[in-house]
Regions:
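Bacterial signal peptide processing site
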Residues: 24-26
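Aromatic-lined carbohydrate-recognition surfaces of secreted/lumenal glycan-active proteins
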Residues: 198-211, 224-248
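C-terminal motif of bacterial Sec signal peptides marking the signal peptidase cleavage site
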Residues: 20-22
Length: 518
């Protein structure tokens, strides 16, 4: 017994046995103790973060607060994101042939609408997703999207007889003059906005499908190169209706030129799948031939943003089935963002049915990433002077975070001061479950376990808290305007004023004494 006590005393002197259980050969769990903090379910609350959930589509206010008839429902949490589309006609009304060759971009183009929108959004802590269009696909809109001086490179298609539609003015997509001029527009936009962190997303621009009108592979390559060269530091997305455009944009050589893989921007949530028919239908030649582009777009859903817009409810369709499909597709196709407009109840003058609202709300809350973190009880240990504990990171959302978020741990003393910052090894970008169920109403949680090691050397006796945070690191090189966000909001309680979440306590006794019995 005396020998045992001597061995224990020696261990204390070395500082290696803060909480050993009698030094009888049984390892101690160590001084770390897990703190329980269950995740907040998507059915209870939305967790707002950048590039996820409901966004202000085409600058329309969020629902339900954007509709006075929906005051019975609580306002949706503010979004970090809004989208805008603007016509080429508005951006470049002046024929460049009438200007000096060395005229600055501000004389060649009218950027005021984009500049004003960026400024207003930044004042609300928001960023912009931008699309430029040369053809407006609304069959009832007689507006012309190309500048007047570009009319010779277009074709007018009258509306069918006895129809309420308007004449459509569509660019000749393979016209060299059109391609060259639109490429110069993209280059100017890139010079002005690619280094602006207020611009989060740029949608592939320069082509829109009209009836059975086609575009050549050579023209596609030219447009893809123009978009990629203009915005190498901005997240690109593409409406995937044209498989050859998708093939080019998802190619490895394009991905290497960009800050991140190209994402998907899909129309018609609630009616059509976020994946186009050519990538899913058994009648598609791409599916039948097992074309590589089919697998490429399916895999891309898990690694890049999927931004959706709701679709108008078809005549005679069931609203319940519409919202159910929207929810199921959000989960199945890893949707990141859902629009604030274009669904049936958006502008309704009567209150939304509570059951339909629940489906709509669940679709928005499930969209995007939804991380939580907690230490696993009973996993703590100590070896020498290093205490350890297992930490579980779980994503309860339909998609992974795709931007620059850096998880880490901080050891905080009783005064609230951070005394240690410890690295995390979890990769949040890969933390998403690949579930293809067509009718799931919640994403399958995906969990990754990290081990935190705390070196006790040099720590003064006292009470400490081990806290987790996910810090914003999404920046553009040499940015003209910088956007800084606080740490990511996690789906759990306990966030402190610095955006940290407590996961464990660490107690170092004042005297480091070891109690023995017998």
């Amino acid at each position: 017994m005396v020998a045992t006590l001597r061995r224990c005393a020696a261990a204390v002197a070395a500082g290696a046995a803060l909480l050993l259980s009698g030094c009888g050969g049984h390892p101690s769990p160590g001084p770390l103790s897990a703190m329980a903090s269950p995740a907040i379910p998507p059915s209870v609350a939305d967790i707002p973060n950048p590039l996820r959930g409901q966004y202000e589509d085409l600058l329309n206010p969020l629902f339900p607060q954007g509709n006075p008839a929906q005051q019975r429902y609580q306002a949706w949490p503010a979004s970090y994101d809004a989208s805008m589309r603007i016509s080429w006609r508005q951006l470049q009304p002046t024929d460049p042939a009438t200007l000096p060759g060395d005229a600055p971009d501000d004389r060649k183009f009218d950027f005021s609408a984009i500049d004003d929108t960026l400024t207003k959004l930044a004042s609300r802590n928001m960023r912009l997703s931008l699309r430029i269009y040369a053809y407006g696909s609304d069959p009832h809109d007689p507006g012309i999207a190309v500048p007047e001086w570009m009319r010779p490179a277009t074709t007018s298609y009258p509306a069918p007889p006895n129809s309420p539609g308007a004449t459509q003015v569509v660019p000749n997509w393979d016209d060299p003059h059109y391609l060259d001029a639109f490429g110069r527009l993209l280059a100017a936009l890139g010079r002005r906005y690619d280094g602006d962190e207020r611009l989060a997303v740029f949608e592939f621009s320069g082509y829109s499908q009209f009836r059975d009108q086609s575009v050549s592979v050579a023209s596609i390559r030219q447009l893809v190169a123009a978009n990629v060269d203009a915005f190498p530091h901005t997240q690109l997305v593409v409406n995937p209706q044209n498989p050859e455009i998708v093939r080019q944009l998802l190619a490895d050589d394009v991905t290497k030129k960009l800050s991140g893989p190209v994402g998907i921007r899909s129309d018609c949530l609630g009616v059509a799948s976020p994946l186009p028919g050519w990538a899913e239908s058994g009648d598609s030649q791409y599916v039948r031939n097992n074309d590589a582009v089919v697998n490429a777009i399916k895999q891309r859903l898990r690694s890049a943003p999927v931004i959706t817009e709701w679709c108008s409810l078809p005549g005679g369709a069931d609203p319940k089935g519409y919202y159910e499909k929207g929810l199921h597709d959000v989960v199945k196709y890893h949707v990141s963002m859902t629009s604030s407009a274009n669904f049936p109840d958006r502008d309704s003058t009567s209150a939304m049915d509570p059951k339909l609202y629940a489906l709509w709300a669940q679709a928005n809350a499930a969209a995007g990433y939804r991380y939580s973190v907690q230490a696993r009880p009973g996993s703590q240990s100590i070896q020498g002077k290093v205490a350890a504990i297992s930490v579980e990171w779980t994503n309860y959302g339909a998609a992974a975070a795709t931007e620059g978020w850096a998880p880490n741990y901080k050891l905080v003393d009783y005064t609230g001061a951070v005394v240690r910052t410890l690295p995390a090894t979890v990769n949040l970008k890969t933390l998403v479950h690949d579930d293809s169920s067509p009718s799931r109403e919640e994403a399958v949680p995906a969990t990754s376990t990290d081990t935190v090691h705390v070196d006790l050397s040099g720590l003064a006796p006292g009470h400490y808290t081990l806290r987790a945070s996910v810090d914003w690191q999404q920046h553009k090189p040499g940015a003209s305007h910088v956007v800084n966000y606080g740490p990511m909001a996690l789906a759990r309680d306990g966030r402190d004023g610095s955006g940290l979440y407590p996961i464990a306590t660490l107690d170092i006794p004042r005297d480091n004494q070891i109690s023995t019995s017998g």
